[in-house]
Amino acid sequence: MLGRRLAGAKPQSGALFKRFVVIPASSKARRRRRDVGGIRKNVSVEELELDKALDLRDPKELEFKLRQLREFTKNLATQIRVADDLVKKEAAQKELGNKSKEEDTADAASVILGTHNHHDRYQRRSLLQGEDLSSIILSVSHQVKKLLPEAILKRINDDELVLRSLINHRNSDWNAIISKLDQSPEKLDGVSQRALKNYILSKAKNLSLGSIRKADAMLLSNINHDLTKFNTSMYEFLFYNLSNLKPSQDPSSKYNNEVYTVMESLLDRYDEAQKVIAGKNVAIEAQEGIMPKVEMNQFILNCCIKFASKLLDVSKMNRFLTKFNRDYHILPNKENYTVIAQFYTKLGLHDKAWDIFATMKFLSADHKPDAKTYTCMLSLCNKEKNYAKAIDLFNEMIDLKVDPTPETLNALVKTLATVSGDPVASEGKAESLRLLAWKYLHQNEDLVNLRSGNFEDTILAMMSLCAYDGDAGLARALYFKYITTRFKSNFESWRMRQGDHSSVDYKKVWASTLNPFLFNYLMLAYANYSPGKLPLLLGFEQGAVTRRNLINNVDYLYKFQNDEAGPRAKLPMLPLADISEPSQILLESRAVWQFNLEFGGLCDLRISPLGSSKVLKDLAASAESIEDFSFQVLHQIALWKTQIVNHNALNPKSIMTYLTIPLKLGEKKEFLLRMSEFSYEQQTFEQHISSLYMNTKQQLLTARPGSSTHLTHSEIKKQPSSQTSFNEESSLAFLSSMKHKIIRNSSIYELTMKAAIRFQDQALATKAWESRGSYRKTLAFQNLPVAERTKKDAAFASLMVDFFTQQQMYTDAMGIIMASQRHISWRYPMVKRLHRKLVELEDTRSIKILMEIVNKRSKSDSSAEAVTSLG
């Protein structure tokens, strides 16, 4: 897969050097390249070049200019509409600031509806109290009639509710309207089909399941429960709102089945209606317009597939596909197949996703995969870590003249970046893959300059490349750019929704601003940083210019920031354009870590939750047993974590990356400090729980000998003397600190063993060995599948062998291998270091034993694979 080699500069003297890279190609044939991206969504007046003469003989140039003008007109109309909404809302807020509740209601309607005239307060009161009150009511009523027909308004009988619910078309509340109609005795009876279709069926959206059921009942009542008159628009309205419902994540909840049951009942209703129609021979009436024609269509199938994909339920997906194909002769279209491919990808059924993709290519021209489909399949290549197939797919798009979108390029870049981080999947071409990804990204200048509409997705793709390359300078610049931009946007959105006079909930603003994926990529860039290595992006001219522009465009000193948010909008980053010292990496990584966990510095992790000591003591005093106390404490810690700590940033993956930073930089003290501060062991937790529980119960018995407690003196004496005892203060402090700690799992113990190897610390290795032995007895480990437990045991045992090999304790290393050969499949990469040392020592006996164990397992594995293939 190797293509041409790039010419590299000669290595310079000193620690810095430039790297030679190779660009992998998907095939031997050289493919022509072309610019991608098409017409940008954000077209400015300058880019239209209105004064430039057009070549009327060139149809491509005319088509290009026409597309530009259409996009510019569309953007201009959108900007005008947004500006009008902002002006109206700001005017309403200013005018309504100091009014009474009655004045607020009247003036809000007048300002929003555009009937506000700039008289002073006395004149407005005169209008309300004087003879012009009727004209104001008539004006408001006239505006309300534009939202709903008069027949429906009379049944709602609340113009203020209609205005409040529907005046903002971006955030309309149809649930309130449906609920009010349902409370009316007339409901929707007698309302014409035309009025229903134009004002409700085509506009009502974001309905809850309860509102959908109410609307369905009212629609049935409107047609006197004659199922043959339940038309297509009604079906589309119900299925559309059902498909937009958010599924419940609670496995015990029946909500998802309720939604699915409603969909099934609608399909059964349609089938029943078709039987009635066939029996009454009403086809002629339908043709004459007496009875509406009812039929299932592609839109309804789209809704069913959409909701089934949200549920991640294969049986329900197959049920809908089979039903529409067999009974209604409706096959999925291109968009449906793309959703189904995404559905199979989420479930991990990769083979079925590829089958769907192959089917689309050979069905018909209408089913031909588009850029969205190719983007979906590139994301699947990312999960499979198959860079060759990803490159082939992209070249296939070019050959078939399918213009790649920014999303397509980002998906390809993420795939190449992910594969480059895996030494096995990258086949030794990690740097070449990352350089190739940067070159693909530069095919669209709007992407690398962050001018496209895919701001977040593009930064995510670029940061993935920086993370695996260790380019901390560019990664921190991109992270800074994203956070400051996103914070400003979220802050302005909050002001628009809540008004300038309400206090800002900075915790919610920061929670929606801090992206855990970008945060982990930044930590990974810190971890992979090496002072003596030049960033790979400097390997070609365009990349060097892009990197320089992005870094220089960041204002770490906030000299040019004019932000109402004040100091809360500032990130704890060093005021340096680039980082050159390991100490700077350690300091900044810790500061950014704390900043993310503390919701932008709004909380302090070092401070225990308010009243935590009293809460824990009360729980211990009221608990009936240690198990009951442990359960209640874990529940309380979960509440603290939700309220105080950004749990999106604190997860097992991010803490592994965070601990890797000092490990790779050789900072033992910082590694141990971070591990103890942000992780805990299950056995330590149980010891503190037991100690606090026993101390609290003993204090109760001592203070009130005659009191009724759940623990007696004899039970206290029965407690094992070997149980580690902590004083009350230390137990309370430990349990309170668990709000920002992650329980240690096999991955953390493996990282600890790597640290012992890195720092040549025998005490740390011994402690890790003993602690993991205790961890293996916990339910968290025992509940894992047998294959996964064996895999984790093998990984840790391999690290132990490497440690003993480094310490020249070859007998102990051989002892581990021989003792575990019945449970662990030892392969040569796991014992490579030990084998090399034994060869140097010419220990032929140990070499023979070692290779027999390795070869025996290899032969048995090969035999098992052969039997499986024959079966």
From Swiss-Prot:
It is found in: Mitochondrion. GO terms for biological process: mRNA processing; RNA splicing. Keywords: Mitochondrion, mRNA processing, mRNA splicing, Repeat, Transit peptide. It comes from the Eukaryota. The lineage of its organism: Eukaryota, Fungi, Dikarya, Ascomycota, Saccharomycotina. Gene3D superfamilies: Tetratricopeptide repeat domain. The gene is CCM1. Transmembrane segments: none annotated. Residues 1-72 form a transit peptide. One of its GO terms (cellular component) is mitochondrion. Its main location: mitochondrion. This is Mitochondrial 15S rRNA processing factor CCM1. It holds the Pfam family PPR_2. Regulates mitochondrial small subunit maturation by controlling 15S rRNA 5'-end processing. Localizes to the 5' precursor of the 15S rRNA in a position that is subsequently occupied by mS47 in the mature yeast mtSSU. Uses structure and sequence-specific RNA recognition, binding to a single-stranded region of the precursor and specifically recognizing bases -6 to -1. The exchange of Ccm1 for mS47 is coupled to the irreversible removal of precursor rRNA that is accompanied by conformational changes of the mitoribosomal proteins uS5m and mS26. Belongs to the CCM1 family. Residues 704-724 are annotated as: Disordered. Involved in mitochondrial-nuclear incompatibility, a major determinant in reproductive isolation between species, through hybrid incompatibility of Ccm1 and its interacting partner 15S rRNA between yeast species.
